[in-house]
């Protein structure tokens, strides 16, 4: 009986020790969204370059901020400001592909920061925004599993 209990306990613990894969669009230094301030997309409505001396790390990504206030806002609620789909092009993810981004082609949809490959791709994404967003959300776990680390 003790052996069965020990075996069940060990088997139940295995998922606890399994590492979760991540898939992040980072530069060689581990910086997300090309060093732009993620909070500024929401507060200013445009890309604003962050400063390396004002940085925070969250979920394996380093973010730069243009002000201490933006850094504080991010630190208090990082999930609100970090880009979805690891910072990859949302339209690409909707097509089950990873694509780089043009920082000027960002958009905020349902309170989430989406990055796009280009403004033209953003326009294509928006032609069927709800459907493309649903496809991207459905494809993302598979991309993380197959291409993540």
PLM regions with names:
Residues 4-13:
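Sec-dependent N-terminal signal peptides
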Residues 19-149:
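Charged, low-complexity intrinsically disordered segments
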Residues 14-18:
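C-terminal segment of classical bacterial N-terminal signal peptides
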